[in-house]
């Protein structure tokens, strides 16, 4: 990957691995607020389903402002799962790079996004490019914008584990994106503090809450009727339904095997439980999961759910077991305990608030923590009723107002979460 990325990213990588803070300045980073603009062209770039869930509410909010012209560019790093989300939110891309290939590599994704973004950016010449989180699409789109000397706004900025291989490649992606970005939209105070430690200008950081909470206002309905035959058949009222998702690269192989074996043994021990596991389309994930759980009674392996199906399934479930970052934020907002199937999390606010627990990938630890929730109603209630630290449903508005403020079209800095 680094063969196509000159000194900037390599210098950042070296500084990061040495545990040092690199400070980069450029004309676009030191620009004062624009004062003579009447309209801002804002390009939102995303490519995966989790990004789309969190960016679509922002796109819809951008469309409300007369002095903002929104442009949507998708890379389709995840083709089918991305399209599901776009349809639900009614967002139609202006550009679709359509980069997804079977068994695609990180190098391949990087190359195709960088080349595709060059043409789009040169044609549209946006005033600012918005990227989200920690995907390869986000990092490379930010880099492409930097090469064109276009401002970058980083949505969901400041999350850190400080282990560049966990999660991989997401931790490095978000650190590199953070070094490029001109504006940083941090969900929480802790994320803000992380950026301050990295010498990011405090005036360029906005604490907004997380846009995923905005998304839940659209997707979760009390009277929602499931489209999935499997979900329609489940007795959510009389069974304890556990929603499971696990697909991260660092969990492939033995970690995922241990997760699946833990699920199998939990179901054996608790006959009133049902497990719903929407299995990621990655062949490496599907092969492992189906080989261990494919014939298991009361374990329902289904194709990935669209965002409305998933959010409403979580809202009616007993608890969630996941290695997903977004679900660590979504489930607590729906009052569901979460066991995180990872060794660490870049969302420690949830751990501190008591809405999630780190189960890791050890079979016995996963079983022990699951049994605590299944056996102890007080422990369950404590997690389910803990305050969600991630937002109030106003993150997209705050981001839009911050952009207007930065470009001189709003006189007051927006309120913060």
Predicted regions mapped to residue ranges:
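Conserved nucleotide-sugar phosphate-binding/catalytic loop shared by glycosyltransferases and other
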Residues: 67-112, 116
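Donor-nucleotide binding loops and adjacent catalytic segments primarily
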Residues: 80-85, 104, 224-316
């Amino acid at each position: 990957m680094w063969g196509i990325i000159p000194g900037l990213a390599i210098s950042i990588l070296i500084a990061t691995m040495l545990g040092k803070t690199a400070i980069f300045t450029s004309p676009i980073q030191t620009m004062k607020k624009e004062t003579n603009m009447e309209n801002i062209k804002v390009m939102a770039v995303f490519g995966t389903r989790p990004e789309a869930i969190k960016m679509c509410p922002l796109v819809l909010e951008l469309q409300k402002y007369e002095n903002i012209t929104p442009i949507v560019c998708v890379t389709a790093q995840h083709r089918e799962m991305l399209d599901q989300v776009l349809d639900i939110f009614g967002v139609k891309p202006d550009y679709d790079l359509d980069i997804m290939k079977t068994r695609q590599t990180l190098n391949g994704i990087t190359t195709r996004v960088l080349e595709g973004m060059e043409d789009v950016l040169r044609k549209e010449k946006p005033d600012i490019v918005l990227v989200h989180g920690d995907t390869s699409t986000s990092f490379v789109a930010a880099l492409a914008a930097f090469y064109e000397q276009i401002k970058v706004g980083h949505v969901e900025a400041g999350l850190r584990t400080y282990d560049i291989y966990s999660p991989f490649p997401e931790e490095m992606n978000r650190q590199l994106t953070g070094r490029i970005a001109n504006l940083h939209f941090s969900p929480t105070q802790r994320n803000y503090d992380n950026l301050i430690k990295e010498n990011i200008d405090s005036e360029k950081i906005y604490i907004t809450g997380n846009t995923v909470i905005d998304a839940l206002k659209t997707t979760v309905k009390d009277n929602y009727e499931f489209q999935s035959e499997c979900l329609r058949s489940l007795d959510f009222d009389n069974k304890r339904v556990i929603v499971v998702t696990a697909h991260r690269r660092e969990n492939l192989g033995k970690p995922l095997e241990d997760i699946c074996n833990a699920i199998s043994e939990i179901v054996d021990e608790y006959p009133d439980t049902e497990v719903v596991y929407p299995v990621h389309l990655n062949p490496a994930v599907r092969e492992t999961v189906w080989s261990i759980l494919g014939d298991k009674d009361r374990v329902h392996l289904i194709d990935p759910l669209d965002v409305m199906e998933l959010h409403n399934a979580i809202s009616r479930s007993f608890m969630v077991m996941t290695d997903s970052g977004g679900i660590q934020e979504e489930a607590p907002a729906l009052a569901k305990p979460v066991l995180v199937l990872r060794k660490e999390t870049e969302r420690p606010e949830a751990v501190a608030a008591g809405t999630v627990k780190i189960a890791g990938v050890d079979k016995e630890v996963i079983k022990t923590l699951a049994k605590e929730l299944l056996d102890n109603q007080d422990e369950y209630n404590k997690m389910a009723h803990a305050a969600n630290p991630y937002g109030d449903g106003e993150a997209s508005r705050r981001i839009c107002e911050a952009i207007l403020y930065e470009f001189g079209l709003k006189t007051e800095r927006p309120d913060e979460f």
